[in-house]
UniProtKB/Swiss-Prot annotation:
Protein name from the UniProt record: Sorting nexin-25
Localization per Swiss-Prot or TrEMBL: Endosome membrane
UniProt function note: May be involved in several stages of intracellular trafficking.
Species whose genome carries this gene: Mus musculus
Domain (PXA): residue spans on this chain: 1-164
GO terms for biological process, alphabetical: negative regulation of transforming growth factor beta receptor signaling pathway; protein transport; receptor catabolic process
Amino acid sequence: MDRVLRDVFDYSYRDYILSWYGNLSRDDGQLYHLLLDDFWEIVKQIRQRLSHVDVVKVVCNDIVKALLTHFCDLKAATARHEEQPRPFVLHACLKDSHDEVRFLQTCSQVLVLCLLPSKDIQSLSLRTMLAEILTTKVLKPVVELLSNPDYINQMLLRQLEYREQMSEHHKRAYTYAPSYEDFIKLINSNSDVDFLKQLRYQIVVEIIQATTISSFPQLKRHKGKESAAMKTDLLRARNMKRYINQLTVAKKQCEKRIRILGGPAYDQQEDGASDEGEGPQSQKILQFEDIMTNPFYRERFGTYMERIDKRALVGFWESAEHLKNANKSEIPQLVSEMYQNFFVESKEISVEKSLYKEIQQCLVGNRGIEVFSKIQADVSEVLRERYYPSFLVSDLYEKLMREEEEEEPDAQLASEKDELGSGGEAGEEAVEGTSGVSDPASFAVIKLRELNEKLEYKRQALSSIQNAPKPDKKIISKLKDEILLIEKECTALQLHMARTDWWCENLGLWRASITSAEVTEENGEQMPCYFVRVNLQEVGGVETKNWTVPRRLSEFQNLHRKLSECVPSLKKVQLPSLSKLPFKSIDHKFLGKSRNQLNAFLQNLLSDERLFQSEALYAFLSPSPDYLKVIDVQGKKTSFSLSSFLEKLPRDFFSHQEEEIEEDSDLSDYGDDVDGKKDSLAEPCFMLIGEIFELRGMFKWVRRTLIALVQVTFGRTINKQIRDTVSWISSEQMLVYYISAFRDAFWPNGKLAPPTRIRSVAQSQETKQRAQQKLLENIPDTLQSLVGQQNARHGIIKIFKALQETKANKHLLYVLMELLLTELCPELRAHLDQFKAGQV
C-alpha cells in the first residue's frame, strides 16, 4: 500500500510541481519532504475516517437505492405516449454551470478543512488555494470525463474486447478432460494462474446454470401414481445434484491451485485449508456417503470440521444415527442429551422454529424421534454441499488418502458400511412392525398400555432434564403438567373400562331417573338441563355402580333421533320441546312437566330388550369424557359390544390435549430467524434487479434462485456472502489494486499519459454502436440463466441507453459524490444543506 501511494505522490510531485518549481528555486528536496509528510498525514486522516464508515450499508443500501431511484426516475421521465411523463429532476447544483462550480467548491473547502494537517489549517490562503486546485483541476475534470457518454462507451468497448481476447486464448489453450479425475488432474498440473482463473470462472458459470436448472419446480409425487416421467425427473434431479457437487469440488481445487501459485486466496476465510503439505493432490475421490458411513473416514472428516469450528454438525449426525438404533429404554436419556448438547448449551445446529417445537415435543414424549431424522438429513445436506468439497482439497484428506494407500482398508470399509446399513434398516423395520393392532378385543388394553408407556417416558424425560447442567424450567413445568394429565387420563380410562364391564354384566338391570332440573345458558339462550341418576335395580348395590350425569334437553332429543332410526316405533314417542315464540322464558311448570315426560322416556328405553343393549343409550348415560361417546349406531347390530365400541374411537383420542398444548406452546424463539431475514442485505439489490430487468412475476423465483446459487457456489447465506464480498472489495489488497490501476492509467510505464485527442461525432457514434453490440453479445450466462434471455437483453439495453445522457450521468455522479463525501466527512452535510437552501 505504502509503495503504490508513494509512487502516486512521486509522479504527481514530478509532473505537477517540480515541472515549474524547479526553475524557480534551487531547493535540494526540502519542499519534497515537507509535502511528503503532509501527504502521509492526509492519508492517515482519510484512513481514520474510513474506519468509521459502515461500508456494507453504504454499498448495499445507500448506493443501490440511489441507483434504483435513478432508474425509476428515468423510466418515469421516458414514459410511453399513453402515460403522462414525469420531469426528471436534476441535482440542485446542475441548475447552471456557476452553481455546479459552487457545489464543487463547497465540497473541496470542507474536504481540505477535514483532511489538512492541523499545522496548516490556520492558513486561510493555503486552504483557499488548495480548495480551488481541487475544484478546478481534480473534481470538475473527473466529473466531465466520467459523465461523457463517449468516454463510457470507449471504456466498455475496450474492456469487452480485452475479455473476448482472453476468452479466445483460453478456449484454444484447453479442452475439457474426458473424465472427472482427468479434469482434476488438469487443474493440478497447470501452473498458469490466468488460465486457472478463467477455468474457475467457467466452473462458477456452470454451477450457476446447473443450480438454476435444478431450482425449477419438480413434478410432485402422487401416492400410488408414480409415472415413468416422475421417475426420470427424480433421476435427473439426483444426477444434477451430483454434477453440482463435482463442480464445487473442482472449483475448490482450482482455488487451492491458484493460491499455491501465488494468486488470490478465494477460500482463505471459509474452508480452513492449511498450506501445509501442499503436495500433489490425490486423484481418488471418496463419495460423501462413504465418508459418513465409515467410522475411520468420518473421524478424519470430524477433525477437519473441528479445525473450522463446525465439529458439532458431525457430532449431531453421529448422535442421530445412534438414536435410530437405540433401545427403547435409552431413548429418553439420549433425546435429553441431544437437546442439551446441540440446542441448549451450544445452539450450533440451526433449525426452523417448527422443528424446534417438534424436538421439544419429542423431549417430553408427545412425538416420536422422527424429527431428529429430519434434522439429520438437513445436516447431511449442509455437510455435503458446504464442507465436503473443501474437505476433499484439504491437507487432512491428502493424509487420509496416503494412509489408505499404505493400509488398504477396503475390506474394513465394506464390512462396516454393511453393518451400519443393515442396522439402520433393521431398526426401521422394527418400528414399522409395531404400527398395527390386529386383535380388536385387546384395543382398550393396548390403549391403556400405550398411556402407561407414555407416562413412563415422560417421567424418565423429566428426570433427565432435571439432572441436566442447564435444566429448562419451562419444559420441566410443562412435563409435570402433562404427567398429571396422563395420570388423570389413565384413571379415566380405567374407570370407563370398569364401568363398561359393569354395564355389560348387568344388562336389563339398570335404571335411570331424573332427580332434578334447572335452566342453563347455552350460546346466549336458555336451555333446560336435567340431572339423571343411573343405578342398578338391586337393593344395596355397590356405591361405585351409581352415578349422576347432567343432560340438556337437546341431548335427549338427539338420543331419541338416533334410536328412532333403529326402532321406528320410537318415533311415536313425543319429547318436550321449547316454545319458538320470542321472549318465552322457561318456567318451573315446564321443567316439572318435561321432567315427568323424560323420566317415562328413560324407563321405556331401559325396559325394552332391544333398546337397553344400545351403544347410544350407554353413551348417553355414561359419565365418561365426550371423546369416548361419539358413536354412530346407524346400520349397526343392536347387541352391545365393548370391542366394537372402543374400536370406533379415533386412534389418537388420548393425545388431543397434547396437540392443543403444542399448538399454543412457545417455549423458545430459537431458530426464528434462520430463514426469515437471511437475505435482508440483498433486498435493495433484488429491487434494483427487478426494476432494471422488469421481472414482475419472476421476482420471487429469481430471488430464491439467487439465494440457492450463493449457497451452493460459496457455501454460505447471501447475507454473509454480501458482507464478505464488500469486505473483500474494500480490503487493503483491493485498495492497492485500485490505486495501482489509477497510477498505471495516469502514468503508464511511469510517464505522464498524453492528453486525449478530441474525437469527431462520427467516431463517437461508431464507438457507441460497437459498444452496444458487444454488450449484447457478451451478456453474462449467469444473468441470462436467472432472468431469461429477453429480460437480460432488455435490461442491458436500458442500462446502456441510460448512460448515453450526459446530464443524467452528471446527476447520478453528483448524487453518489454527495453520498460518499458526507459519509467520509459528516461535517459536509450542514454546508450542502445551506447550499441547497440558497437554490430555492
